[in-house]
């Protein structure tokens, strides 16, 4: 098996964990000698997704995607998203009895429910239909697997995540700021639940790195918060490294790459007990999870930074990509 097609509705120029995961996996696969083709919205007619304009929804893609897959004749197909491109690839694979894998990157039903009065049960029914024929539905954590199993999903496999340990580094000489810097970094959008952090009455300087549809409203509502916009690469790594506590208020993520990036930088994490944080954060060791986010922050500030870094060193993109490869279903195995 040497050629892999990844089909995704989420791709550059979007800035999010899904794109980082897929682009890094593509690079790691290519380092291993694989020929990787990404079928993304690039080159297709598309419209902005309502409430999330950075995502482009491709129009009338079914025949075009089918022609591309027929022409490529890949050894394996991975469908990363449940959008129009994912649906088109799924349709082609089913019609040609071509085995495929899928992955689950976002708690889609909960995400949709935040924006529209669609019952969560309807969304999960759609997801069971979408992922049901896959050889494997890949998830990042045990808690996410347990949740999906309880909702009737089957054929679930593990695909964890990694972190760039050379970019995100721990400052062993770090001295806590007075007051401490409490950092959120990521997309500024309703599903990230940032307001739960910003409205806290806690001791510390609240700092937000990132942008998104909720940014303007939050700037107006919380004038005391430092909003610094998007940061990338070394600038992002510096922002994270200088923080005293990383606050992750989301309840809809399935992993949270930024958690690993914070830990690799020696920064303890405070979060709610949701999938992702529950799998990565050990209370008192590298952060704290609690339904009382203020309490979680206070406890996380007591954590040893070197222990955070040591925990993150267990994760690498090489290991994650090996996991991904092991779950693929080559066509000759059908």
Specify the residue positions occupied by each region the protein language model found.
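Donor nucleotide-sugar binding/catalytic pocket of nucleotide-sugar-dependent glycosyltransferases
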Residues: 125-171, 177
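Conserved donor-binding/catalytic core segment of Leloir-type glycosyltransferases
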Residues: 174-209
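Aromatic "clamp/platform" in nucleotide-sugar-dependent glycosyltransferases that forms part
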Residues: 251
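Nucleotide-activated donor-binding/catalytic signature segment of Leloir-type glycosyltransferases, i.e.
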Residues: 216-234
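Short alpha-helical donor nucleotide-sugar binding micro-motif in glycosyltransferases
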Residues: 131, 230-231, 238-243, 324
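A charged, aromatic-enriched C-terminal amphipathic alpha-helix characteristic of glycosyltransferases
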Residues: 301-332
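Short hydrophobic beta-strand element within catalytic cores of glycosyltransferases
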Residues: 259, 264, 268-271, 281
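Nucleotide-sugar donor phosphate/pyrophosphate-binding loop at the beta->alpha transition
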Residues: 99-101, 110-129, 139
């Amino acid at each position: 098996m040497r050629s892999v097609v990844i089909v995704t509705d989420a791709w550059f120029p979007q800035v999010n964990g899904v794109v980082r995961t897929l682009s890094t996996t593509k690079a790691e696969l290519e380092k291993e000698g694989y020929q990787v083709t990404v079928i993304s919205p690039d080159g297709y007619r598309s419209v902005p997704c309502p409430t999330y304009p950075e995502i482009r929804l491709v129009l009338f893609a079914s025949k075009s995607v089918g022609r591309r897959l027929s022409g490529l004749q890949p050894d394996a197909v991975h469908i990363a998203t449940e959008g129009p491109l994912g649906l088109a690839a799924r349709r082609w694979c089913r019609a040609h009895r071509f085995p495929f894998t899928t992955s689950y990157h976002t708690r889609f039903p909960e995400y949709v429910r935040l924006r529209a009065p669609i019952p969560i049960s309807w969304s999960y029914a759609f997801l069971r239909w979408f992922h049901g024929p896959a050889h494997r539905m890949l998830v990042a954590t045990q808690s996410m697997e347990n949740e999906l199993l309880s909702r009737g999903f089957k054929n679930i496999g593990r695909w964890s995540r990694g972190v760039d340990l050379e970019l995100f580094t721990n400052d062993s000489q770090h001295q806590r700021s007075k007051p401490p810097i409490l950092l959120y970094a990521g997309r500024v959008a309703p599903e990230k639940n940032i307001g739960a952090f910003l409205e806290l009455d806690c001791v510390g300087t609240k700092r937000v790195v990132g942008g998104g549809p909720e940014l303007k409203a939050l700037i107006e509502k919380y004038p005391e918060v430092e909003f610094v916009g998007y940061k990338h690469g070394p600038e992002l790594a510096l922002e994270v490294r200088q923080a005293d506590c990383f606050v992750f208020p989301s309840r809809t993520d399935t992993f949270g790459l930024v958690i690993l990036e914070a830990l690799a930088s020696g920064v303890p994490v405070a979060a709610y007990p949701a999938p992702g944080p529950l799998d990565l954060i050990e209370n008192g060791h590298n952060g704290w999870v609690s339904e009382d986010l203020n309490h979680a922050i206070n406890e996380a500030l007591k954590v040893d930074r070197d222990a955070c870094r040591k925990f993150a060193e267990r994760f690498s993109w090489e290991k994650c990509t090996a996991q991904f490869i092991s779950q693929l279903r080559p066509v000759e195995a059908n």
